Amino acid sequence: MSSSLIEVRKNNLPAYAVFAAMLSAAGLPIYIHAPKYFVDEYGVSLAALGSVLFVLRLFDVVQDPLLGRLSARLGRRRVFAISIACVVMALGMLGLFAVEPLVSPLVWFGLMLTLVFSAFSFLTINFYAQGVVTASSLGQFGHLRLARWRESGALFGVCIAAIAPLVFLYFIDAPFDGFAIGFAVLALVAGTMMRAEWAEGRGLKSAGFQTVLQDPIARRLLIIAFVNAAPVAVSSTLFLFYVEARLMSPGMEGPLLLLFFLSAAFSVPLWGGVAEKLGTKSTLMISMTLAIVAFGFAIFFGAGDWLAFAVVCVASGAALGADLTLLPAMFAKRMGEISPAATEGFGLWSFVSKFTLAFSAVLLLPALQWAGFESGSDSNSSHSLFVLALLYAAVPCVLKIFALILLAFTAVSEE
């Protein structure tokens, strides 16, 4: 690979950051905002919302692998299909937050999320698969270099999306309308910036699902991704409830969310530098340990402890930065070795990553309701608040420990 060509590919990396920001804005922030929005605005029960989210993720059991296979077969039509998916996701987000439900709120919630999640799946699979092709042309540590741009953009996208409705609240009467419109504009801009990149993946032969699933390292990395992503899914789903009810600090949700995601975003280049010196696996194990310690403290916080929790947000946010950068880079590197087209591999990766969010929704939200917890109430019992603390902090600790053990016994390259 000539140095001039490598330099050209480096100049295209900002497009990956912007596109990742758009995708991430439709990921975790939806789980942060949508359940609470539909509870507060339309009175939908937590258990019902959790059930809908779980059913949608079960749909992904079939959808994501099939979308991966479809992507591998699109050929020259891929650019057009990706453009359509960007438009569909923008329309779904507008329908979710900026349009009054045309049917019952629960049904509308499910329909709009189906549009958002389906487009999200298709775009994510193609985006990460394209990253394998691009990273292979960037020389040594190419996967880490691309991951820094991609995940930094993703985390800044999460930061903006997480606090945007809270910020818009000070300027407009319908903050979620502003959020949805802003997302739609970002989707169009990001799709335009990445348009030239999609052609690079043409002509690569698909290796199929069997190649990915029969590879012991790829299989183990998928399992680790599932277990390691679950703590993020759990804490993201319960974050607003934890700050509002357990810490009794209404109004601090926005600043604490921003602190958490900014810490993650600014940690990405630092983790990348450490990984180049210590190795990717060793660095990821360090970050997992940091997350375990941080969530361990959060179990014991109570009313008014928002300042101590801010420290936890910094530490756990930094750990998230490593999770989102290093683990996908490890998987992408493996896909480059066994399945260069990578679409089926990232179809499986997308399913695994999102199924953890379904796990959190279907188990945690109903569990909170059964414990007697009520969102926005000042009279939640000590038992329900204790259950909230256990679900928010103790469950992620246990899952992270399991992921750390799995990674320790996985033979992967440190590059």
Positions of the model-derived regions?
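Membrane-embedded alpha-helical bundles of multi-pass transporters/translocases
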Residues: 2-415
